[in-house]
Amino acid sequence: PQEFNLFADQAQMDIFEQYFYDINQFNRVPGNSTEYADMLTLLEEKIAIFKNIKLLNFVDPYYIKPNELYRLGTLETGFGEVEQVTHKEYLNIKLSPLARPTLKRAVFIDTPQGYRIYPTFTNNVQCHYVRKPRKINWGYNVINDTALYDATTSIDFQLHPSEENNLIVKILALAGIAIKDPAMYQIATAEDNKNIQQEKA
């Protein structure tokens, strides 16, 4: 079960991370007016279950990032959206009387310690973000030297139902590598490549 948990988690993250590369690719191509075939709409639907909004904790002078953060969307105060800038941009902005940050036109810098908002703002700040999928756990109890499934400690996949085949193929490929079966790995990789070609066509 432990190997399955590792394979399952890796496969889920591979599929999840691919969504963002695909969005970038499909943003460069004209959209599709067919309601159920527009790839950007389908990708947004797949990511929707991972979108969160959270009030951030303030530990002077930083707003602490959510632990499960994968990609930041926006930060919002009661005055509206806060614009992200680099440290260098902030140094230039604060010197300009017209561009200097105000409560209604705040800016923030993303640092390893958290988000630094200018001007200093200690009220509620909402973070809109995409979270990481939870780690997969095939929960089990060992009874008479046999691992028996335990639903109370298990964490299931969180991907869109349409990803079931991709998930199986990716887990199969990882298992093929682990048991050193090149045929199983090659079959799974060929199937994965076929799926990718169909999606990108």
State where each predicted segment sits.
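Glycine-enriched, solvent-exposed interface loops adjoining structured elements
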Residues: 1-201
